[in-house]
């Protein structure tokens, strides 16, 4: 009887210790999960909200929209001001947006599946404010455009190829002071004067101070049949533009 009581006590102690280990392990796992996500969230965004942001020149500056569809899907029509980094490329192009880890990042695709996968990749790589927007097949966006958008570094690289016409949509005085190589001066109100200076079969690059004035020019050129790429980063934002006199 004495030995049996000793065995029962040992069993109780073992069970108690095992329960404590399980509970402690669960708490640690929960805490670890919180640490991995406490500074980063993925929030669903309604299409109407994104449309509102894209049509507000002040609000749109607070967001970067990334269309993670393939290039041909993006070129067929995309949300205004969205850049294109496909889901298949996003891991290899993290450096292109590494300076924006604290900015509001909106990802979008056709149905929401690829954009959610992209958001998870961004989350794992330190991006903190992520929004997964309704896909273009789920919501009828009013802000769709065929004007492509790139960031300042890529814009400079495109200019350097010499394969594009370039339009500077800043004030004429600022253009006269310095501008991107080969650029001509113009704005949305002088499109009629610009057209004779732009070969029809040659794609056009547009830029300004912040991307707004140049986008207005870009949309009018796109409506006139040109392939247009606009710089989201203007000369006030991307200080590495190679400006010449």
Which ranges hold each PLM region?
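Rhodanese-like catalytic fold shared by cysteine-dependent sulfurtransferases
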Residues: 2-12, 16, 26-55, 59-63, ...
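Hydrophobic membrane-insertion alpha-helices, especially the h-region
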Residues: 19-22
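Phosphate-rich cofactor/ligand-interacting catalytic cores and adjacent structured alpha/beta frameworks
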Residues: 67
């Amino acid at each position: 009887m004495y030995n049996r009581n000793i065995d029962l006590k040992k069993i109780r102690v073992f069970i108690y210790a095992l329960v404590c280990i399980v509970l402690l392990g669960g708490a640690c796992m929960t805490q670890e999960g919180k640490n991995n996500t406490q500074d980063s969230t993925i929030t669903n965004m309604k299409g109407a909200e994104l449309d509102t942001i894209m049509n507000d020149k002040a609000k749109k500056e607070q967001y970067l929209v990334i269309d993670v569809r393939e290039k041909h899907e993006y070129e067929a029509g995309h949300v205004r001001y969205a850049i294109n980094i496909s889901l298949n490329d996003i891991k290899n192009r993290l450096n292109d947006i590494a300076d924006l880890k604290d900015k509001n990042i909106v990802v979008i695709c056709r149905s929401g599946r690829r954009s959610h996968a992209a958001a998870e990749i961004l989350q794992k790589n330190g991006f903190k404010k992520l929004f997964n927007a309704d896909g273009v097949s789920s919501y009828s966006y009013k802000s769709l455009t065929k004007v492509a958008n790139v960031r300042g570094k890529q814009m400079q690289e495109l200019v350097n190829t010499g394969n594009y016409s370039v339009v500077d949509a800043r004030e004429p005085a600022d253009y006269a002071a310095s501008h991107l190589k080969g650029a001509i001066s113009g704005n949305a109100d002088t499109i009629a004067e610009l057209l004779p200076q732009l070969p029809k079969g040659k794609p056009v690059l547009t830029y300004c101070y912040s991307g707004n004035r140049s986008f207005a020019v870009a949309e009018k050129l796109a409506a006139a049949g040109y392939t247009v790429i606009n710089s989201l980063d203007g000369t006030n934002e991307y200080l590495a533009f190679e400006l010449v006199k």
